[in-house]
């Protein structure tokens, strides 16, 4: 449960970096692809929406960094960066610049779109990285035709990858065939896929700790 709270807290904190004119800019350090670092204040940003099934993953894809709060910032694209680290005063929050696995494609191929986004690092162990993002669950109904409910998505990547594989959204706990879908998400790791298929694994295990499956990846990979 503590891990679930830490995921949500990290996402909310980055979501709170939506810098309106009456809010304080946040300190950050951006690392570009060539290794150069840009330090300053993020004074604005833009977001990008990616599909995850019928749901939508929301990531920051453009940041504006200035030397001082209140100044106009220089624009930087996530496509040109490795990561950005936000300094909140009490802790640093690392966000990697990642492509997201193309909707309805297989993790074995790591196919992706053309635009990266920054994703919160919430797990890092033995070359396996867990990432969290804001999202909206999409529900089709008669009134209104579509409802979009704020939520979060957890993804993973192998260290050195540029593509994040989404594997968990809270509504998955109630989805028919959720174990099959999760097994595909981890098909790069045959032993993990077999573990998910087996009787010892329950989807509800991820409800309170979506990162617990990554410990199993580290153990079995």
What are these regions (language model features)?
Residues 1-25:
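Bacterial Sec-dependent N-terminal signal peptides
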Residues 24-33:
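A short beta-strand micro-motif
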């Amino acid at each position: 449960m503590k891990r679930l709270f830490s995921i949500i807290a990290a996402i909310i904190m980055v979501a709170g970096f939506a810098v309106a004119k009456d809010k304080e800019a946040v300190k950050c350090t951006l690392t570009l692809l060539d290794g150069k670092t840009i330090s300053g204040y993020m004074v604005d940003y833009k977001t990008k929406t990616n599909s995850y099934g019928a749901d939508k993953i929301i990531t920051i894809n453009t940041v504006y960094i200035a030397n001082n709060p209140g100044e106009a910032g220089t624009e930087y694209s996530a496509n040109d960066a490795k990561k950005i680290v936000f300094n909140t005063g009490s802790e640093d929050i690392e966000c990697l610049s990642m492509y997201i696995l193309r909707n309805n494609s297989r993790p074995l191929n790591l196919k992706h779109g053309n635009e990266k986004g920054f994703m919160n690092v919430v797990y890092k162990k033995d070359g396996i990285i867990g990432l969290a993002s804001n999202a909206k669950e999409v529900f089709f109904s008669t009134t209104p035709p579509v409802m979009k409910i704020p939520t979060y998505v957890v993804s993973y990547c192998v260290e050195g990858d540029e593509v994040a594989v989404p594997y968990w959204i809270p509504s998955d706990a109630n989805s028919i065939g959720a174990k099959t879908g999760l097994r595909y998400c981890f098909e790069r790791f045959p032993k993990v896929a077999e573990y998910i298929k087996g009787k010892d694994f329950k989807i509800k295990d991820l409800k309170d700790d979506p990162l617990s499956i990554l410990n199993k990846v580290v153990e079995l990979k």
